[in-house]
């Protein structure tokens, strides 16, 4: 779910923090991709006659087709993706997960009614609401990525938190996910729509955290409190406080505790046993991989292994899989070229104008070769 209404709020109050780019702008970039979010998208979008793709045994293959072709698209544009898989959800998410189970149960009832009535549109709508990423989906995608030569990371907890940690450590340029809470976890750069269908023609949205908090006029800790007031996966919100009111209150009172001390509690009742402090700690000190020992390696694809798995087991077209493997191998060589800005360590907030100037100068010269991205120190909670 992420953070309720955060993208719209940033667009309204800090529009300069959002840039829109074409996928070609990310040549030479390493990006941490939220795997579970991608797989969910593929299960929803990659369909035939309203149903997920399946092999002859009735096994779902939509996630594999989506992962294979979207990854190739990124690699063809010089992007080096690393997929990050969710680990065990935090205990504080149990309430949100219970709500999702209830919504699925309700969708099952509505689907039955739609099937009895023969309502085609409703059948498709409620079928999509039942989509859930399973352990098998994850394991099959990991196997596919290994054969493609693409690295992946198993997060100990939330994938978005580990994506953010990889960005802060200088291992990758950005976190790619539709969940806005990657910003709350502290990723300096968030990309949305990177793995969206090409047919949708959606520009990639690039959010810069430093510019968000600078333009709103708050600190990162206050931004986390703001996100908690907007609504997250980890605790309830104060009913009656919308986005505009939340910003005004944070600017005026600085912390949620001070807000509680100063608002009319009859008008704005605070949830009983409200876990906002625990939620804040989870955002500021999340459980993530040790980035100091995390190595990301992009290697040659295993064409024969891909054919055995995708064609032998999953019954995809051999010609298409071999063609895809050759594209991976070809573009892997091309993407070893680096970006000019990889040679410079950026400190603090960089304006989009300066970054564009640097990139335009770099594109006019012969691209330099580099052995990787500069490694930075990762500090939890920043």
From Swiss-Prot:
GO biological process, alphabetically ordered: base-excision repair; DNA replication; DNA replication, removal of RNA primer
Which EC class heads this enzyme's classification? hydrolase
Q: Which residues are involved in binding Mg(2+) 1?
A: 34, 86, 158, 160
Q: What is its main location?
A: nucleus
Q: Tell me the keywords, alphabetical order.
A: DNA damage, DNA repair, DNA replication, Endonuclease, Exonuclease, Hydrolase, Magnesium, Metal-binding, Mitochondrion, Nuclease, Nucleus, Phosphoprotein
Which protein are we looking at? Flap endonuclease 1-A
**PTM comment, free text:** Phosphorylated. Phosphorylation upon DNA damage induces relocalization to the nuclear plasma.
Q: Which SUPFAM superfamilies match?
A: 5' to 3' exonuclease, C-terminal subdomain (SSF47807), PIN domain-like (SSF88723)
Phenotypic consequence of residue 33 to I = In allele fen-1a'
How does the annotation summarize its subunit structure? Interacts with PCNA. Three molecules of fen1 bind to one PCNA trimer with each molecule binding to one PCNA monomer. PCNA stimulates the nuclease activity without altering cleavage specificity.
Domain of life of the organism in this record?
Answer: Eukaryota
Q: How is the co-factor bound, per the entry?
A: Binds 2 magnesium ions per subunit. They probably participate in the reaction catalyzed by the enzyme. May bind an additional third magnesium ion after substrate binding.
Read off the HAMAP family from this record.
Fen
- Give yes or no: UniProt keyword Metal-binding: yes
Lineage, top ranks? Eukaryota, Metazoa, Chordata, Craniata, Vertebrata
